[in-house]
Structures are given as C-alpha cells and as structure tokens.
Curated annotation (Swiss-Prot):
The 4 large subunits of the cytochrome b6-f complex are cytochrome b6, subunit IV (17 kDa polypeptide, PetD), cytochrome f and the Rieske protein, while the 4 small subunits are PetG, PetL, PetM and PetN. The complex functions as a dimer. This is Cytochrome b6-f complex subunit 5. It is a single-pass membrane protein. The gene is petG. GO terms for biological process: cytochrome complex assembly; photosynthesis. The chain crosses the membrane at residues 5-25. Signal peptide: none annotated. It comes from Prochlorococcus marinus subsp. pastoris (strain CCMP1986 / NIES-2087 / MED4). Component of the cytochrome b6-f complex, which mediates electron transfer between photosystem II (PSII) and photosystem I (PSI), cyclic electron flow around PSI, and state transitions. PetG is required for either the stability or assembly of the cytochrome b6-f complex. Keywords: Electron transport, Membrane, Photosynthesis, Thylakoid, Transmembrane, Transmembrane helix, Transport. Belongs to the PetG family.
Length: 39
C-alpha cells in the first residue's frame, strides 16, 4: 500500500519537476532560434 506521505510528496514534486523542465526548455528555445526569429 502507498503511504499518504509518500503519495503527497510525489504529487507535490511531479508538477514542480515538469514545470521546471518546461521553463528551462522554453528559456533555451528563446535563447536560441527564438531570439533570432523575433529580431
């Protein structure tokens, strides 16, 4: 059985991790070809 604490930690960390990866990928994209296209 899954412990409530472990379940809460996973549910808390997963969205933060996905958000962090998305933001870092978006920043790298903007820093790369995205900036050239905007200019």
């Amino acid at each position: 059985m899954i412990e409530p604490l472990l379940c809460g930690i996973v549910l808390g960390l997963v969205p933060i991790t996905l958000l962090g990866l998305f933001v870092s990928a978006w920043n790298q994209y903007r820093r790369g070809s995205g900036m050239l296209d905007m200019d």
